[in-house]
Regions:
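Conserved Radical SAM active-site core
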Residues: 15-165, 175-204
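Single conserved hydrophobic/aromatic residue that forms the stacking wall/gate
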Residues: 2-13
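Structural preference for beta-strand elements that scaffold enzyme active sites
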Residues: 99-101, 137-139, 168-170, 216-218, ...
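Generic beta-strand/beta-sheet core signal
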Residues: 103-105, 141-143, 172-174, 220, ...
Length: 390
């Protein structure tokens, strides 16, 4: 049944259609875009925003700051709640859209306004309580900045979030590039301050385990690398629900590689050579993982290379921000063997471009090697290493 109304040229045209379909039958409709309209952009000017620290000349899509509650539900994007209307809040609650992922950073209203350069940022924290009271699952993120929202402020924030009954909170250290001219003077974490932050998060997480049966608060892997501490065991991370935030990735990969190797028989006949390239931060653990593989396949030569991030500079040392240009510059004179293995997180969704717009074809051509992007799991990594030449 089609019920249409129109008031003439230029007026609003509204159509209501009722359809009937069989049980389990597809409705047969597709939207042109998954959001059906434009993405909502961010209205904040956060003092720690990574996008504000990007160099000029990168592809335009990298400079877009989204802050859209629909993307939170669809893809797990974090939203700040400064760009959401009462109507949208009511709709989320009415439709029980869950989970919602929120960039909290601090529950101190005045400090949140300062950190996000938005005078309304403190007011929107009330939405957290409304969501929690409605039974909406809340996953939270805190970008921790030394001397600003760490220490006692972090304790306050975690206490408030625990009392709200949030599902999970990922705490990650601020990332600083060399492109910070005219930006807020932030300082990076060091060994001492990273260790102090780990102690706070672990202590409060341990208390949550005793009271609620789950940890709730998780420090990013980068904190442990900065503090030069061992990564916790896989059990610490429970269901590994925050891998996309850099929480537990090293423990997950190490454990998953171990399980994969248990399924395979040792094979001394494999005698090819491969290179695996990663960020400087994870390099010691990647060396350890490659040693695990070598124990089972001793005649495979594995060249593990840490790539210094000259493109972003600063303290950026994570694998996902390694660029194609840095790979080419630093591996040009290496004997790379049959294939160069990288994490697929270095590439955009289509797996064809690095952040600096260097393509995978460019890297293969310049280095004369087959480039093999792998996902962050043991099966893909082990198979890529033992496969040899294509």
């Amino acid at each position: 049944r089609d019920s249409s109304t129109s008031r003439g040229l230029g007026d609003v045209y509204k159509r209501q259609i009722e359809m009937t379909k069989g049980e389990y039958e597809e409705i047969g409709l597709e939207f042109e875009t998954y959001l059906m309209d434009k993405q909502h952009s961010c209205r904040n000017k956060c003092i720690f925003c990574f996008i504000d620290q990007l160099p000029k000349g990168m592809r335009e899509s990298l400079y877009f700051k989204d802050d859209d509650s629909r993307l939170s539900f669809l893809f797990g994007n974090y939203i700040t709640l400064t760009n959401i209307t009462e109507h949208e809040i009511d709709r989320i609650i009415k439709m029980h859209i869950s989970p919602i992922n929120v960039s909290v950073h601090t529950t101190n209203p005045e400090l949140r306004c300062k950190m996000m350069n938005n005078r309304f940022a403190g007011d929107t924290l009330k939405y957290l309580k409304r969501f929690a009271d409605a039974g909406i699952t809340l996953n939270c993120q805190i970008v921790s900045c030394p001397g600003i929202n760490d220490g006692d402020e972090l304790v306050r924030t975690l206490t408030d979030l625990e009392n709200l009954g949030v599902n999970m909170t990922a705490i990650v250290p601020v990332g600083l590039t060399r492109y910070r001219e005219n930006l807020y003077p932030l300082v990076p974490y060091n060994k001492e301050t990273a260790g102090q932050t780990i102690d706070i998060i672990e202590k409060m997480g341990d208390e949550c385990v005793k009271k609620h049966g789950r940890r709730i608060f998780f420090p990013g892997d980068e904190f442990y690398l900065l503090a030069e501490r061992e990564i916790p065991s896989p059990e610490f991370y429970e269901d590994f629900s925050a891998l996309e935030d850099g929480i537990g990735m090293i423990a997950y990969l190490t454990d998953d590689v171990g399980w994969k190797l248990e399924e395979l028989d040792a094979d001394e006949s494999l005698c090819h050579k491969v290179t695996i390239a990663c960020g400087e931060g994870v390099f010691p653990y990647m060396k350890r993982i490659m040693s695990m593989i070598n124990e089972k396949f001793p005649n495979i030569t594995i060249n593990t290379r840490a790539i210094k991030n000259n493109f972003f500079g600063g303290g950026v040392n994570v694998s996902g921000l390694v660029t194609g240009g840095d790979l080419i510059d630093q591996l040009r004179d290496d004997d790379l063997g049959d294939r160069l293995i990288i994490t697929s997180s270095m590439l955009r969704f289509e797996n064809d471009l690095f952040l600096d717009d260097v393509s995978t074809d460019d890297v293969e051509r310049e280095l004369g090697v087959t480039l093999v992007p792998v996902n962050n799991n043991g099966n893909d990594l082990v198979e890529a290493v033992i496969a040899g030449k294509d």
